[in-house]
Amino acid sequence: MSTITSPRDPETNPRIKAVFDDIRTTRKSDFINNLWYYLAFDTELLEATWRDVKEVMTKPSHLDPLTKELIYAAVSIANSCEYCIHSHTAAARSKGMTDKQYAEFLSIVSLAGRTNHLLNGLKVPIDKEFNHESS
């Protein structure tokens, strides 16, 4: 259950409509997912979040779009964000992720989680070669 109520007709606010229109244009889709409807309860939060998402996730960069979605999905799994897991897994699939890639991705996430817990519990000292200053 949400902690806020999504605005009934958010696009009557011109600032919200501008964000939603930009989302539609950027994604080449008429679909506005619930995240944006619920963030519309606060126009400034909506604008800032979309600005950051657009900058990081949609602009050409050194990482390809599928890799970005997989990173986002991995962090979402680590943070137990069910909504984000679903939305970014769907986005990864739309960017070409296969079932085999998804299975491999989940194996890596699982392995990283397990070894992170082991190393946190054991408090293994960090090798000096892994420090940036040693490079």
Model regions and ranges:
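Hydrophobic alpha-helical segments
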Residues: 1-135
